[in-house]
Regions:
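Alpha-helical protein-protein interaction modules
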Residues: 1-187
Length: 187
């Protein structure tokens, strides 16, 4: 209507709506965090994280906040039957949650690899620490190590590929012998 009257449209409503969407996304992610930390409601957390990431993809892409990683932990835990709200999940829903966990971990792994390519000296230590944590995190016990044998073959292969790629990135980030100072001989 304003344009029809020859007046320029204000961009303020669009900016306010975008700011509200970002705030809603942040709030949704924070609620997901609360579901995990205080309520052990992992399935609910996954839904909150999914909606928050869809509304503001930057929330998922921030490696330092570990939000996408924590969302993957929630999905893996719910898929394993852990948490207050996991009892109602059927096999199909558990498989979907495992796939969601895999997708989120794969996205983070790709982002860490890109960071290593762009800033190897700066990222190396964080990557080594993070990849070691992933390998040891009990949240993924049902999709790692010997537990992989319990998964359907196609799913098992995808998870094994993730763990293999994770180890490859960890090794790539590890200090190379030619970069390490040579020990001095003592007389």
């Amino acid at each position: 209507m304003a344009k029809a009257l020859g007046r320029p449209r204000s961009a303020a409503p669009a900016r306010r709506a975008a700011a509200r969407t970002d705030a809603d996304a942040q709030e949704g992610a924070q609620l997901g965090d609360l579901c995990v930390q205080y309520k052990k409601r992992y399935d609910a957390a996954v839904r909150l994280y999914t909606n928050a990431f869809a509304a503001d993809p930057k929330l998922a892409g921030d490696l330092r906040s570990e939000r996408r990683y924590n969302a993957a932990c929630s999905a893996a835990l719910a898929a394993a039957g852990d948490g207050e709200d996991a009892a109602k999940l059927d096999a199909k829903e558990r498989a979907r949650l495992r796939q969601q966990a895999l997708t989120w971990l794969r996205a983070d792994l790709t982002a860490w690899a890109k960071l290593l390519d762009q800033q190897p000296d700066k990222a190396r230590r964080d990557i080594l620490k993070t990849m070691q944590h992933w390998q040891q995190d009990a949240d993924f016990a049902h999709v790692h190590g010997d537990s992989l044998a319990k998964l359907p073959e196609a799913e098992r292969k995808k998870w094994q590929k993730l763990w293999d790629d994770l180890e490859a990135l960890r090794q790539r980030a590890a200090p190379q012998p030619e970069l390490m100072p040579t020990p001095k001989e003592e007389p």
